[in-house]
Amino acid sequence: MNRASLEKRPDEVATMFDDVAPKYDVVNDVLSMGQTRRWRRIVVDAMDVKVGQKVLDLAAGTGTSSEPYADAGVDVVACDFSLGMLKVGKRRRPDIDFIAGDATNLPFADNSFDASTISFGLRNVVEPRKALEEMLRVTKPGGRLVIAEFSHPVVPLWRNLYTEYLMRALPAIATKVSSNPDAYVYLAESIRAWPDQDHLAQWLSDAGWTDITYRNLSGGIVAVHRAQKPDEHRESVPVAKLRRQIKPRHQAG
């Protein structure tokens, strides 16, 4: 069995995802009790991209998150550093452009995409702040970024129940449905170690993104952050003004 440590060495993380690739989407549906696909639909709505626009879907894995864009006539590039995931995705959707790439050193020119997105992948990057800077670099001025990531439930009782599920129930279920249950121990540990909604918003501001908002889904189990790359003639909003800039939405979603 292969699992990554919380040091998130790229070779370990890539190997772990290679191992789980064949059943990745099915296991996700089971472990999220069917919520994963709903969360991804909300991300697509938040992206609000048009036919003919070009979108970067980073940490796209098998391309499940890329499919809605391709089906809608959007030029989507599915990028991931797990070759195993990309192979599964290319077999499923040969019409989608799958490209191997490192989130901290993207293989794209500046200002290549009208919008960028990453769902449930930023947490697995060894230098997530560098990834935010790289996505800023490859996104066109005025372009949008949408991030979906596991976060921190906002209701204390719900937070306690969720922690119990992560650390006890999830690994037990993974043993039954996954070929590499140890990978889902890493999943639980990495979620617990991930910063909360406001900290991620601060990282976005530090990276140069503006107009930052977030929305909590399922009581804060997942947060969807949205931001914009400044137009070339605009200056980034000072970090001191971030609290006034962020407009959190705490509904369960």
UniProtKB/Swiss-Prot annotation:
Extent of the signal sequence: none
Full protein name: Demethylmenaquinone methyltransferase
Record-level Gene Ontology MF annotations: demethylmenaquinone methyltransferase activity
Superkingdom of the source species: Bacteria
EC numbers for this chain: 2.1.1.163
Transferase listed as a keyword: yes
Annotated function: Methyltransferase required for the conversion of demethylmenaquinol (DMKH2) to menaquinol (MKH2).
Matches recorded under SUPFAM superfamilies: S-adenosyl-L-methionine-dependent methyltransferases
InterPro entries: SAM-dependent_MTases_sf, UbiE/COQ5_MeTrFase, UbiE/COQ5_MeTrFase_CS
Biochemical pathway: Quinol/quinone metabolism; menaquinone biosynthesis; menaquinol from 1,4-dihydroxy-2-naphthoate: step 2/2
Keyword entries, A-Z: Menaquinone biosynthesis, Methyltransferase, S-adenosyl-L-methionine, Transferase
Listed PANTHER family: 2-METHOXY-6-POLYPRENYL-1,4-BENZOQUINOL METHYLASE, MITOCHONDRIAL, METHYLTRANSFERASE
Reaction(s) catalysed by this chain's protein: a 2-demethylmenaquinol + S-adenosyl-L-methionine = a menaquinol + S-adenosyl-L-homocysteine + H(+)
Residues involved in S-adenosyl-L-methionine binding: 62, 80, 102-103, 119
Species annotation: Paenarthrobacter aurescens (strain TC1)
Entry's family note: Belongs to the class I-like SAM-binding methyltransferase superfamily. MenG/UbiE family.
Enzyme class of the recorded protein, top EC level: transferase
GO-annotated biological processes: menaquinone biosynthetic process; methylation
